[in-house]
């Protein structure tokens, strides 16, 4: 579309025709070229808008994404067991163990505890506590019971600075503190596990020894009976061997005694016979008698050569 239709035609009039489509096409090409190669400020604007640049698969994470977010822990802090007692006389009903709160208590006006407002609501309603504390503050300031120093106006700046930090970086600070706390807890748990490693190994060894002792107790009567039988058999064999040795010794002694006795008797008998024979030979009458008889017998023999 051109501007020629919007202008009246005259003799001395000049009409300038501008091709709108070509201008639009030129601006479109310039914008496309700018998107392909954005400058520094365009990149910065894309970063704040969360628009991914060319070549990025995902949109960039904005630095203000965690602003005004409330952090909550994925799991609560470990609590003390209810049956835990450091001493049997500890009264857990009247004096329980103090529990570490995970989150700060409920507050109003960013710093006033909610427990200060609750008692007034039963009598004055919801607005009563605010009027009371506001009037008390005005009374103390008016009567100069609460005197501001020269730097008192700086409190407003510190409050604004606190709100700015907590609303912008409070989520990341809480998350970092929680992760650091978990790492510290895991570190101390590792130390405790290392200290109790020997106790755990001793417990396992004791359990195995207990099982072995129970199995030994079950088979102990049979083993004791077999052991006693072996001991009795060994003692019996030893006694039998002792009896056999003693009996053999006594038999050998009797045998040697009888042999010695027989030998002595034989020697005495031979000695007696020899002495009697020698005595007879020494007698002349016996010698002559038998000698003559022997000579006659020899003569009567017919010797043949």
UniProtKB/Swiss-Prot annotation:
Location in the cell: Mitochondrion; Mitochondrion inner membrane
Protein name: ATP synthase F(0) complex subunit B2, mitochondrial
GO biological process: proton motive force-driven ATP synthesis
Self-association state and partner proteins as the record states: Subunit of the F-type ATPase which has 2 components, CF(1) - the catalytic core - and CF(0) - the membrane proton channel.
Annotated transit peptide: 1-22
Keyword Ion transport attached: yes
Species of the source: Caenorhabditis elegans
GO annotation, cellular component aspect: mitochondrial inner membrane; proton-transporting ATP synthase complex
Chief location category: mitochondrion
GO MF term list: proton transmembrane transporter activity
Keywords: CF(0), Hydrogen ion transport, Ion transport, Membrane, Mitochondrion, Mitochondrion inner membrane, Transit peptide, Transport
Function statement: Mitochondrial membrane ATP synthase (F(1)F(0) ATP synthase or Complex V) produces ATP from ADP in the presence of a proton gradient across the membrane which is generated by electron transport complexes of the respiratory chain. F-type ATPases consist of two structural domains, F(1) - containing the extramembraneous catalytic core, and F(0) - containing the membrane proton channel, linked together by a central stalk and a peripheral stalk. During catalysis, ATP synthesis in the catalytic domain of F(1) is coupled via a rotary mechanism of the central stalk subunits to proton translocation.
Disruption phenotype: RNAi-mediated knockdown results in either embryonic lethality or arrest at the L2 to L3 larval stages. RNAi-mediated knockdown results in a delay in somatic development. RNAi-mediated knockdown does not cause sterility.
